[in-house]
Amino acid sequence: MLPQDTNTDPLPGDDAESASGKSADASQGTPNPGDEVAHPRRIRSFVRRAGRTSTGQQRAMDELGPTYIVPYQPEPLDWTATFGREAPSILEIGFGMGETTAHIAGLRSQDNFLGCEVHEPGVGALLKLIGERGLQNVRIMQHDAVEVAAHMLTENSLDGVHIYFPDPWHKKRHNKRRLVQPPLVKLLASRLKPGGYIHCATDWEEYAHQMVEVLSGEPALENTSKADGGFAERPDYRPVTKFEKRGLRLGHGVWDVVFRKK
């Protein structure tokens, strides 16, 4: 799930997963000192959630964490050193319990995936999947993705960004806490290479329209969809999650939004 503010209602259980990518070496540039996401109320990419780490998740943390968890440090990330190869680089913001990330990483073995998630059971769950499936192209940053993007990712270094099912903050007075807002979109657009993409998905229709509006307002981006409303077909690489299937059975919609850097 995507983190955002700590003094908030708890998140609905199943609400975030991620994926996307193309190669970049962080030595190409450095983050600008002023690259902060300016917002009257600082937006975070996550919400603090209670949750118990299972025995299997903890074992994965202990055994695989040292290899696959990348420590946060406010300096440019060297993608080649981090992954041991040059490949397209994808940032995943809020991967929840990691099933979608693991699925996409398995399908797209040619890409490198950096997943940001602060929820420890989710980190442990993805590490467990990495071990079970032998995934070599995933690394995890257990830190706020907004700070990672601002201070560790350089301009023109990403091939894609995935933001799947972020908290919709459905109460009107909480809308300002939503993740997809102009300051973050501007920051992410600066980190994308020309031709790189931002792929969002949500099951909250009003938030879906806001996503299209906010992304359309960023001059560096263009919508890949010409359909009414600006929504895209679900790309083949994004699986339908259990949470999503349940919603679809109940008649709830899901909207994909895909924009590309000009």
Curated annotation (Swiss-Prot):
EC number: 2.1.1.33
Basic residues composition-biased segments: 40-51
Pathway(s): tRNA modification; N(7)-methylguanine-tRNA biosynthesis
A single Gene Ontology CC term: tRNA methyltransferase complex
Region (Interaction with RNA): 173-178
Membrane-spanning segments: none
Binding site for S-adenosyl-L-methionine: E92, E117, D144, D167
CDD domains (UniProt xref): AdoMet_MTases (cd02440)
Pfam families recorded: Methyltransf_4 (PF02390)
Active site: D167
Reaction(s) catalysed by this chain's protein: guanosine(46) in tRNA + S-adenosyl-L-methionine = N(7)-methylguanosine(46) in tRNA + S-adenosyl-L-homocysteine
Region of interest called Disordered, as start-end residue ranges on this chain: 1-58
Keyword line: Methyltransferase, S-adenosyl-L-methionine, Transferase, tRNA processing
One MF annotation (Gene Ontology) recorded for this entry: tRNA (guanine(46)-N7)-methyltransferase activity
Top class in the EC scheme: transferase
Residues bound to substrate: K171, D203, T241, K242, F243, E244
HAMAP family: tRNA_methyltr_TrmB (MF_01057)
Reported function: Catalyzes the formation of N(7)-methylguanine at position 46 (m7G46) in tRNA.
Family: Belongs to the class I-like SAM-binding methyltransferase superfamily. TrmB family.
Protein name: tRNA (guanine-N(7)-)-methyltransferase
Organism: Cupriavidus metallidurans (strain ATCC 43123 / DSM 2839 / NBRC 102507 / CH34) (Ralstonia metallidurans)
